[in-house]
């Protein structure tokens, strides 16, 4: 919500905040539904997205690079361990964003690269607030996330942890039309 500070009294402004998949974001900017978009992707797909942005005549600027952390309930036993590794999550339920999508890459390959391979139980949820409510209230759930502000974690009773063996790199890229 920091962007709302840019809205000055007496100056007209409208912001639309929508969570969606990368292709919907790209198409919305190309169709001029929106002037800007932010696309998140795993760094291993960077060439694909760079070529796509070029093909769609979009300019892109990296605004963040990060590794996902895990969030869980502050009351979960893992929240109090000195060190957490991937094996600790085997009996847990993974809360996942419901649309891990990379166009022209087979869906099975995207799922393999985005989902924790040895976890057998998942809840797919699109909306961030619902994800956080589930994590705070359903025992033995976890989710991979970009860095989350402490105030938001506190609001939902969550903690953010680094997990050994989970070092996938991601990028958030601002896109806009070249014209």
Set out the residue ranges of the language-model regions:
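Structural motif
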Residues: 1, 40-42, 74, 97-101, ...
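A late-sequence structural motif
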Residues: 74, 159-179
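Secondary-structure junction motif
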Residues: 2-5, 45-47, 86-115
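Conserved beta-strand scaffold positions in the cores of enzyme catalytic domains, especially
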Residues: 14-17, 57-60, 94, 122, ...
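Flexible hinge/capping segments at coil-to-helix
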Residues: 52-68, 72-94
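Hydrophobic hinge/microswitch elements
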Residues: 20-25, 29-35, 39-40, 99-160
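Central regulatory/effector-binding core of bacterial HTH transcription factors
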Residues: 1-50
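Structured helix-beta-strand junction loops
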Residues: 32-33, 66, 81, 91-92, ...
